[in-house]
Amino acid sequence: MNIRPLHDRVIVERQESESKSAGGIVLTGSAAEKSTRGIILAVGNGRILENGSVQPLDVKVGDSVIFAEGNIKAEKIDGKEVLIMSEYNILAIVE
């Protein structure tokens, strides 16, 4: 995949969520929630500050992250669905 996000945006591949409930029931359709975890595939150069300097991002390619769903753009690139979001949408890095 050859894509470079701009500024503070990142490209994330969503990880599949568990399709079974805690009780072992298989969830289908709307009952199965979309995962809010993913792997960072690409990062922009950073956020441009008011003074013109660039603040590097805290995340890097390969990081496993938890993100908020709001203000995310889903795109198909090379046949794979990826998410384009601002670093602001990332809530945590899973270590």
Curated annotation (Swiss-Prot):
Main location class: cytoplasm
Keywords, alphabetical: Chaperone, Cytoplasm
InterPro entries in alphabetical order: Chaperonin_GroES, Chaperonin_GroES_sf, Chaprnonin_Cpn10_CS, GroES-like_sf
A cellular component annotation (GO) from this entry: cytoplasm
Gene Ontology molecular function: any one: protein folding chaperone
Family assignment from sequence similarity: Belongs to the GroES chaperonin family.
The protein's assembly and partners: Heptamer of 7 subunits arranged in a ring. Interacts with the chaperonin GroEL.
HAMAP family (UniProt xref): CH10
UniProt function note: Together with the chaperonin GroEL, plays an essential role in assisting protein folding. The GroEL-GroES system forms a nano-cage that allows encapsulation of the non-native substrate proteins and provides a physical environment optimized to promote and accelerate protein folding. GroES binds to the apical surface of the GroEL ring, thereby capping the opening of the GroEL channel.
The protein's name: Co-chaperonin GroES
Gene name, Swiss-Prot/TrEMBL: groES
